[in-house]
Amino acid sequence: MLHKKYRPNVAAIIMSPNYPNACEVFIAERIDIEGAWQFPQGGIDEGETPLEALYRELLEEIGTNEIEILAQYPRWIAYDFPSNMEHKFYAFDGQKQRYFLVRLKHANNIDLNKHTPEFRAYRFIHLKDLLKKIVPFKRQVYRQVIAYFKREGYL
């Protein structure tokens, strides 16, 4: 039996500073794939905890890690890379992720160009519009984590 190899990764569902009064989530468009919108995410370095990786990745990708952690998805959740997708992680079949639900403290601190840019644009959108914007191969994972945070009363 062939075992799949997944890259350890963290992902952030970032609520706007207006949370809980407004249920708007941050999404960003990848710089390398036009029209590919997603939550900020990134690999966990060796010796790093998922929480440490979260703070580092947010600083690298959106220029700020001034967040309030609201909750964490209780398990690792994995997705496979599409077979037709050229990706830079050829040693992996996909990614296994730890999801964090966070609230951004100050939206005006977002700077996509603070480090090497990974995103070309960002926006806050209403939760009900989220899945329409996300690439198809990530939708099931997004559905699952959003449903969990809804059941827990966060969304």
Swiss-Prot record:
List the ranges annotated as motif Nudix box: 42-63
| Cellular component, GO annotation | cytoplasm
Q: Which cofactor does it need?
A: a divalent metal cation
InterPro entries the UniProt entry points to:
Nudix_hydrolase, NUDIX_hydrolase-like_dom_sf, NUDIX_hydrolase_CS, NUDIX_hydrolase_dom, RppH
Entry's transmembrane regions: none
The cysteines covalently paired via disulfide bonds are none
PROSITE patterns, alphabetized: NUDIX (PS51462), NUDIX_BOX (PS00893)
GO biological process terms, semicolon-separated: mRNA catabolic process
Keyword annotations from UniProtKB, A to Z: Hydrolase
Q: Report the Pfam families cross-referenced here.
A: NUDIX
Q: Which residues form the Nudix hydrolase domain?
A: 5-147
For this protein, what is any one GO molecular function term?
Answer: mRNA 5'-diphosphatase activity
> What Enzyme Commission number(s) apply to this enzyme?
3.6.1.-
In UniProt terms, what function does this protein have? Accelerates the degradation of transcripts by removing pyrophosphate from the 5'-end of triphosphorylated RNA, leading to a more labile monophosphorylated state that can stimulate subsequent ribonuclease cleavage.
Q: Which family does it belong to?
A: Belongs to the Nudix hydrolase family. RppH subfamily.
Q: What NCBIfam families would the database entry show?
A: PRK00714.1-3, PRK00714.1-5
The protein in question is named RNA pyrophosphohydrolase
Q: Which species expresses this protein natively?
A: Helicobacter pylori (strain P12)
- Please spell out the taxonomic lineage of the organism that makes this protein: Bacteria, Pseudomonadati, Campylobacterota, Epsilonproteobacteria, Campylobacterales
What's the gene? Answer: rppH
